[in-house]
Amino acid sequence: MDSPEKLEKNNLVGTNKSRLGVCGWILFFLSFLLMLVTFPISVWMCLKIIKEYERAVVFRLGRIQADKAKGPGLILVLPCIDVFVKVDLRTVTCNIPPQEILTRDSVTTQVDGVVYYRIYSAVSAVANVNDVHQATFLLAQTTLRNVLGTQTLSQILSGREEIAHSIQTLLDDATELWGIRVARVEIKDVRIPVQLQRSMAAEAEATREARAKVLAAEGEMNASKSLKSASMVLAESPVALQLRYLQTLTTVATEKNSTIVFPLPMNILEGIGGISYGNNKKVTAKA
C-alpha cells in the first residue's frame, strides 16, 4: 500500500487552491447575468437532476467546485463557465476474460474471474484517472496473472478463496487513489489441458483403487481375528459348540432350499472325534 505522502503527491484533487481571480469573477457575473436575461428558458438548461445513485462533479472554469461532488437532487450549472460530469455510484461487475497463465510448476492454464467494485469518491474517479472503469479492468487482468503465476496448479485448484482474497486486497490498495472500493473478487473457472486432465483422472483412480485394497485387507484381517477368537471360545466350551450346532440346524430348516441336508447327530461326531483321538495316541505310543 502506498504511503500517505505518495498518495497526496499523486492525488490531483484539491492541489490547486487558488481562487477564480478577477477574470474569473467577471466571467461568473456575466454568466449569471446571461441566465437572468434568458430566465425562463435558461432554467431548462441550467437546472440538472441528479439521481439518488449518482453524483455530479462540477468544473467551474476548469476547477472542481468546492472539491466535492454534488447531488442527489437539483443542481445549478451556470452557462458557459460550468461543465459537469455524472458518476454512477452503483456496484459494477467487471468480467475478466480467460487469461493464459503459466503456474509456478510450469503448467499452462486459463483462468477467468469477476470483480465487483463501486466508486466511493466521484471526484477522485474523475480527476485522478482518465477512464476509471477501463483502468480497473486492465489492472484486474494484470493482477490476476501476477498472483496466479506465483501459485502451483494444486494451490490454484484448492485455494480459490484465499487467492481471490489476495487479489481483492491488491486491487483495493491500487485503486484507492481512483476512488474505487473493491467489494469482491471471484475466480470462475480454471481450464487445464486435456492431457493433464487425463493424467489427473488416472492418478485419482489409482489412489481410489489403492485405498479400496487397503480397506479390503483391513477387513479380512479383522474378520480373521474374529474367527480366531470365536474358535478359541468354542474350543474351551463344548456347550457353546452344541448351541452353535442347534442354531445351524434351525437356520437350515427355515431356508427354502431344494437340497435337503441331513446333519450328523452330535454323539456320532463325538464318537468319531474320540476314535480319531485314540488312534492318534496309539500312533504316538508306537513311535
From Swiss-Prot:
GO cellular component: cilium; membrane raft; neuron projection; plasma membrane
Lipid bilayer topology: Single-pass type III membrane protein
Expression by tissue: Expressed by all dorsal root ganglion neurons and is selectively expressed in neuronal tissues. Detected in olfactory epithelium.
GO BP of this protein: signal transduction
Record's keyword annotation contains Transmembrane: yes
Compartments where located: Cell membrane
Pfam family, one: Band_7
Stretches that traverse the bilayer: 25-45
Gene3D superfamilies on file: 6.10.250.2090, Band 7 domain (3.30.479.30)
Segments on the Cytoplasmic side according to the record's topology features: 46-287
Annotated signal sequence range: none
Role noted for this protein: Required for the function of many mechanoreceptors. Modulate mechanotransduction channels and acid-sensing ion channels (ASIC) proteins. Potentiates PIEZO1 and PIEZO2 function by increasing their sensitivity to mechanical stimulations.
UniProt family annotation: Belongs to the band 7/mec-2 family.
The protein's name in its UniProt record: Stomatin-like protein 3
Biological source species: Mus musculus (Mouse)
Encoding gene (name): Stoml3
